[in-house]
Amino acid sequence: MQTYPEESLRLAAKDEADLEVVSALLQDAIIAGADMHYDAQHECFMAVANRFCWERPALADMNDSSGGAVHERALCGVRIDHVTAVQKRRWPADMRDAFLNLLALKLLAMPKQDSDYLIELSFSGGPSMRLTVKQIDIVLCDLD
């Protein structure tokens, strides 16, 4: 995993362990349907996520309506390269207007004879997206 020495988050994920870190950082991120795009010609999936800044401490002297800690949020660009196919399950009909809560990114098992990987994005309420990728190559970058 490569990190960059700035306050904003910049990560490159290249293996399953890196993917787990990316998943943790994107847990509970809100992604608008209009902010997700698969570019088949360039084999990449891109999204803009409004993520919790889990790596930073909770804001001091602030609580939410239930008394819980309040964390900062940041807009984060996500790019997954080497994507050869996208499958959507239980996807909202009005996707462009939908806002989805990302629960996790998971690496799923592929058939033994297949050298590709399958990355699943799971959202609350049941929707999911499966990306078939030739290799794990993900970049996260907080947007200014």
What are the residue ranges of the model-derived segments?
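General N-terminal targeting signals
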Residues: 62-66, 95-103, 136-140
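Long, hydrophobic N-terminal alpha-helical segment
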Residues: 1-46
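Hydrophobic, ordered structural segments
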Residues: 1, 48, 53-57, 68-72, ...
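A generic short-segment signal for beta-strand/edge and adjacent turn/coil regions
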Residues: 2-5, 13-18, 45-50, 70-74, ...
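Residue-level detector of solvent-exposed, low-hydrophobicity positions
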Residues: 11, 52, 59-61, 98, ...
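Short, well-structured hydrophobic secondary-structure segments
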Residues: 27-79, 84-85
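Glycine-rich, aromatic-bearing surface loops/beta-hairpins
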Residues: 143-144
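Intrinsic, low-complexity N-terminal interaction/targeting segments
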Residues: 16-30, 85-123, 129-133
